[in-house]
Every structure is written in C-alpha cells, then in structure tokens.
C-alpha cells in the first residue's frame, strides 16, 4: 500500500462570483500561466458533514486524485489535503482520513453528493495565485474569481483589489462556496 501523507494549511482567499463578461475582462487583463481542467466529486457522510460546515471532495487534475477537506476557522479555512490512488468512496477509508474523521466527529462510509467540472485559468503572482474558474455546475455555467494568498495577507488583499480595479471591477464578497453551489443549490 502506498503511503500518501496528509498536508495541512490555512487557506486565506478572496472569492467573487462574476459574469462571463467580467471573467473575460480579468482574464484578458492578466493573461494566464496555465489552464487546468479539474473534475470535482463532492462527498458527504451520515450524519451530514455540512451540519458542521465541512466540505470534502476528491479533485482529479492532471492524472492525480486529491482529497481535500475544508474546515472553517475564525480566520480562513483549515484545509486538509492528500493524494489518493483513485477517486472513489473506498479510497477515503485509510488510516489518516479515518483519524481526521474521528477528530471532527464524522463517520465513514461516505457517498457522492455532487460533481462538477472546472476550467481553471491560473496566474501565479508573488503574493498569491489568481484563479479564474469557469465551472459547469448542475448543467449551468458558473464564473468565479479566486485569489488565494500565499504571502502577507494584507498586501495580498490590496494586490487583488488593485487587479480588480484595473479590470474595472469592484470586489463583491462571495459567501457561497463551489461546494454549496454544487451540492446545496440543486
């Protein structure tokens, strides 16, 4: 059996739902370093992890399968992530994920509760990663801009707001995650 260690980080990001026109404005202004096609399968358990505002998925990108669990914190989101050998409910039944489930009071097994495909236009900056996401969620197009801060949080936010300003956009906080739009808004 292959051992895939779990990574933990505190995700601080700014997200905004946009129209297709706004998406194109920012993409044309910033350019992109690469475009990734991501297949996301969202999972839940009984009782539901959404009652604790926890989201979990396995994302297939570039031939790899990444398990991610997002747990809200006072500031940011605790993100637990590890590579898996496959995208299936059975792949989640391993010691590290069972320990995480125990810590959070969740139980296996899990079941699929939603799926989506995202075309991520990625641009890396010194203060963070700009992700321009066009997703197909339950048969409809969804456009979202994310700036995931990798440096100083205040400088990263200022940089992102300046990018939006250059594109003629004003920041509108997005309170609905992709998980919520895919799973809860069906």
Tell what function each PLM region has.
Residues 123-135:
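Short amphipathic beta-strand starts and helix->beta connectors
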Residues 58-62, 134-136, 149:
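Short, low-complexity Ser/Thr-rich regulatory SLiMs
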Residues 24, 132, 155-156:
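Short helix/loop capping segments that flank catalytic or ligand/cofactor-binding pockets
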């Amino acid at each position: 059996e292959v051992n895939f260690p779990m990574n933990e980080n505190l995700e601080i990001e700014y997200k905004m739902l946009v129209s297709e026109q706004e998406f194109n404005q920012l993409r044309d202004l910033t350019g992109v370093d690469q475009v990734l096609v991501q297949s996301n399968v969202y999972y839940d358990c009984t009782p539901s992890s959404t009652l604790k505002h926890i989201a979990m998925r396995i994302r297939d990108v570039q031939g790899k399968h990444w398990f991610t669990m997002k747990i809200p914190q006072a500031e940011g989101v605790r993100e637990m992530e590890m590579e898996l050998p496959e995208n299936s409910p059975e792949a989640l039944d391993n010691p590290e994920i069972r320990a995480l489930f125990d810590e959070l009071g969740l139980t296996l097994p899990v079941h699929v509760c939603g799926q989506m495909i995202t075309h991520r236009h990625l641009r890396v900056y010194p203060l963070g990663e700009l992700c321009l996401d066009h997703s197909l969620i339950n048969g409809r197009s969804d456009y979202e801009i994310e700036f995931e801060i990798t440096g100083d949080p205040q400088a990263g936010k200022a940089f992102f707001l300046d990018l939006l300003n250059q594109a003629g956009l004003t920041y509108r906080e997005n309170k609905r995650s992709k998980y919520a739009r895919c799973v809860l808004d069906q």
